[in-house]
């Protein structure tokens, strides 16, 4: 590797990975509830293991949803439909342990501190307080058209295409569980110049050879996802490097909601506040705050105000207004942090109810985000991925 160059690696997983099964079940339940009761409070956690699904959490709603049916339908859609996979949508046990949201939390969400103390500026927006304290990050970079870091973008692309090859029976020996990883080489100007390493581990039928899998992935997977200009004779490929991946899914490893937070976001390229997304209604700022921060970051880069930016927003439980907002452009902007923050505050309402209204979050849009990343999804119409405020933001800041 040339002097002053460096490597960065990100990973993704398929929709059949145990942790992603759990995420998708949690979000499928959330969608089912919020489609009937947009104001429901949902904090839904799922655990999957051999032959068993446990759904637990706190849900406050006036509607009924058939949780076992949602669980089985989700597992079936993912592709676990045979007992020999060690996990079958029809025969697995489904247990539920659901309580209501704590009234101590509810009182701070239902009526924010600003409203309770008489300091509200906008009564309708400040009536809702943050569902928890915490810090969230949003990130954007001009490395890709989607304004995402290249390593995670390619890792997601490989995982998504691999799933397509399985579900369309193009490669009918593939099974649902899989992981991908991409290492990108950056030059001295921090621009991606080549792919150094690709790792793919995919569950498969026991009778297929590793040589056939490797041949097929080089034919049907890599050329469909990765621009040939990034590949060279020194690019390394590791395909099922253990030599066998027959036992997978919940039979191989237990899965849990919220255990793939780096896969869900920026692949480690940006910081993470620690809060997971799936199974949480939009009053939970772990989710809505991170979506809003991405929305802000993406519009800053789309406006040409920075080449790369990380936005942090933080909240106190039961308080509507963020306790802090910070913006780091890594030296790629001609404008000060305060100039950018002033522009953001003028255009983006980062109070929980403001975010919910701005991004129209009381809708069943979450199940689709629970695999292959929440950001940079050009295959989906996600409100936090829009750059509709870029021009207005530019006019506010550029004098």
Curated annotation (Swiss-Prot):
Cofactor(s) needed for function: Mg(2+); K(+)
Organism: Listeria monocytogenes serovar 1/2a (strain ATCC BAA-679 / EGD-e)
Keyword Cytoplasm: yes
UniProt-annotated binding residues for ATP: 17, 177-179, 244-245, 253, 259-260, 276, 280
Reactions the enzyme catalyzes: L-methionine + ATP + H2O = S-adenosyl-L-methionine + phosphate + diphosphate
GO molecular-function term, one example from the UniProt record: ATP binding
Family: Belongs to the AdoMet synthase family.
Record text on subunit structure and interactions: Homotetramer; dimer of dimers.
Residues that coordinate or bind Mg(2+): 19
Cofactor note: Binds 2 divalent ions per subunit.
Name of the coding gene: metK
Keyword Transferase carried by entry: yes
Protein name (database record): S-adenosylmethionine synthase
Positions that bind L-methionine: 58, 101, 253, 284
Gene3D superfamilies: 3.30.300.10
Gene Ontology biological-process annotations: one-carbon metabolic process; S-adenosylmethionine biosynthetic process
Region listing for Flexible loop, in residue ranges: 101-111
Cited Pfam families: S-AdoMet_synt_C (PF02773), S-AdoMet_synt_M (PF02772), S-AdoMet_synt_N (PF00438)
Subcellular location: Cytoplasm
InterPro entries, per the entry: ADOMET_SYNTHASE_CS, S-AdoMet_synt_C, S-AdoMet_synt_central, S-AdoMet_synt_N, S-AdoMet_synthetase, S-AdoMet_synthetase_sfam
Binding site for K(+): 45
């Amino acid at each position: 590797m040339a002097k002053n160059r460096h490597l960065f690696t990100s990973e993704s997983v398929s929709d059949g990975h145990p942790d992603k099964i759990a995420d998708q079940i949690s979000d499928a339940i959330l969608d089912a509830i919020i489609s009937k009761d947009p104001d429901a409070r949902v904090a839904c956690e799922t655990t999957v293991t051999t032959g068993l699904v446990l759904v637990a959490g706190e849900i406050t709603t006036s509607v009924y949803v058939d949780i076992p049916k949602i669980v089985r339908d989700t597992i079936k859609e993912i592709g676990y439909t045979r007992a020999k996979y060690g996990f079958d949508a029809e025969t697995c046990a489904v247990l539920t342990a659901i309580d209501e949201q704590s009234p101590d939390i509810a009182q701070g969400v239902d009526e924010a501190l600003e409203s309770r103390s008489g300091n509200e500026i906008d009564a309708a927006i400040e009536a809702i307080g943050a569902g928890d304290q915490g810090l969230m990050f949003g990130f954007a970079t001009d490395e890709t058209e989607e304004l995402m870091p290249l390593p995670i973008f390619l890792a997601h692309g490989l995982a998504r295409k691999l799933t397509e090859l399985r579900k369309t029976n193009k490669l009918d020996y593939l099974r649902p569980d899989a992981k991908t990883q991409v290492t990108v080489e950056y030059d001295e100007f921090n621009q991606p110049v080549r792919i150094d390493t690709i790792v793919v581990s995919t569950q498969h039928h026991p009778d297929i050879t590793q040589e056939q899998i490797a041949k097929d992935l080089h034919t049907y997977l890599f050329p469909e996802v990765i621009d040939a200009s990034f590949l060279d004779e020194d690019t390394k490929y590791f395909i099922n490097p253990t030599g066998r991946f027959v036992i997978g899914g919940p039979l191989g490893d237990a899965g849990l909601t919220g255990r793939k937070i780096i896969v869900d976001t920026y692949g480690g390229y940006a910081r993470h506040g620690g809060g997971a997304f799936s199974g949480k209604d939009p009053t939970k700022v772990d989710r809505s705050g991170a979506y809003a921060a991405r929305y802000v970051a993406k519009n800053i880069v789309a406006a040409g105000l920075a080449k790369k930016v990380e936005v942090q927003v933080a909240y106190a439980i039961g308080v509507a207004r963020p306790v802090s907002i910070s913006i780091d452009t890594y030296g790629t902007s001609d404008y000060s942090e305060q100039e950018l923050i002033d522009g953001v505050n003028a255009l983006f309402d980062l109070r929980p109810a403001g975010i919910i209204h701005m991004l129209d979050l009381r809708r069943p849009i979450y199940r689709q985000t629970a695999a292959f990343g929440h950001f940079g999804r050009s295959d989906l119409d996600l409100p936090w991925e829009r750059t509709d405020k870029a021009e207005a933001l530019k006019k506010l800041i550029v004098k």
